[in-house]
């Protein structure tokens, strides 16, 4: 694999300093030779040393020696720009290699930026290069290292970013591009353009589909890396692109395509919310899917799981049975339903025992203790018997009155 390219000439000047007296060579010439002839009869200067025959024969040799002796000490080269610790933890740092033009601005959240990206491992092995990578700033379309560092750049700037794996591909790594697990990365980023994002209301049907699909694919990538917060954010952005008000007419086919895409995003959003234990939000997402597609197996299954996580076994079991009826061979639904039936039986047993305890365990009458008479009967039984007797008398009176 290729390693990092050398910095460009402007970057080298920024890091090492520009050379002094760039026009020095124009001092050589005929006039210098004439000056040398005029000085030939003078004794050598002790503090400068006598030139050799070869040096004296070169045109302008004494002039060059004189200028070298009288030339002021060169100014020290400016130190390279310090690294900026973006988050203050040393895990994400940025250094400007080539500054942006004077007056250039920084991009804002929500703008679409285009960058030239070169990505390498810490050992210098280049793993990816994207000459025209475009993404919406702040939408989590790319790794966090880019989303957090690009807002600190000016348009036209080139910067080096070093990032811990936490802000790149994490413990899972990546297949494409291939990134090993827990790999820190070096990014060379050039911010080329920054433009306002699209007006969702003015998007055509196909443009909405394309935008929503991009956000959904970003969510899928985050989900596969077990970054469920970012996955949920991407799915939510996809749904927003689909459901926002439209000022452009769409065909029936486009509306149907958007509806199918919305269902996919809601299902994936519910899966992410389940992973985050956000049960109420997951329940809302599943319910929205079932409003459009009452027989959607994924939504039925996830809704049943959400209710089960909340302890609502009586509601969860019929929903899972409905899902199993739609797909009888699904082993996952079979296993989940069997588990819930057992949990429901255990829950009922616990509830029965609790009710008996609250009512004084009526299934077993207390044994008579020696030395105790009728007063040993609990007061609640006496009160209950009295109430029943009074009720019977009242009922008899009513019947007699009617007759």
UniProtKB/Swiss-Prot annotation:
The modification Phosphoserine is found at residue 287. TPR repeats lie at residues 212-245, 263-296, 297-330. Its EC number is 5.2.1.8. The chain crosses the membrane at residues 381-401. It comes from the Eukaryota. One of its GO terms (biological process) is positive regulation of BMP signaling pathway. PROSITE patterns: FKBP_PPIASE (PS50059), TPR (PS50005), TPR_REGION (PS50293). Residues 28-39 have a biased composition (Acidic residues). Residues 110-195 form the PPIase FKBP-type domain. Its cofactor is Ca(2+). It catalyses: [protein]-peptidylproline (omega=180) = [protein]-peptidylproline (omega=0). Keywords: Apoptosis, Calcium, Isomerase, Isopeptide bond, Membrane, Mitochondrion, Phosphoprotein, Repeat, Rotamase, TPR repeat, Transmembrane, Transmembrane helix, Ubl conjugation. One of its GO terms (cellular component) is membrane. SUPFAM superfamilies: FKBP-like, TPR-like. Pfam families: FKBP_C (PF00254), TPR_16 (PF13432). Ubiquitinated by PRKN during mitophagy, leading to its degradation and enhancement of mitophagy. Deubiquitinated by USP30. Residues 26-54 are annotated as: Disordered. InterPro entries: FKBP4/5/8-like (IPR050754), PPIase_dom_sf (IPR046357), PPIase_FKBP_dom (IPR001179), TPR-like_helical_dom_sf (IPR011990), TPR_rpt (IPR019734). It is a single-pass membrane protein. Homomultimers or heteromultimers (Potential). Forms heterodimer with calmodulin. When activated by calmodulin and calcium, interacts with the BH4 domain of BCL2 and weakly with BCLX isoform Bcl-X(L). Does not bind and inhibit calcineurin. Interacts with ZFYVE27; may negatively regulate ZFYVE27 phosphorylation. Binds the immunosuppressant FK506 only in its calmodulin/calcium activated form. Constitutively inactive PPiase, which becomes active when bound to calmodulin and calcium. Seems to act as a chaperone for BCL2, targets it to the mitochondria and modulates its phosphorylation state. The BCL2/FKBP8/calmodulin/calcium complex probably interferes with the binding of BCL2 to its targets. The active form of FKBP8 may therefore play a role in the regulation of apoptosis. This is Peptidyl-prolyl cis-trans isomerase FKBP8.
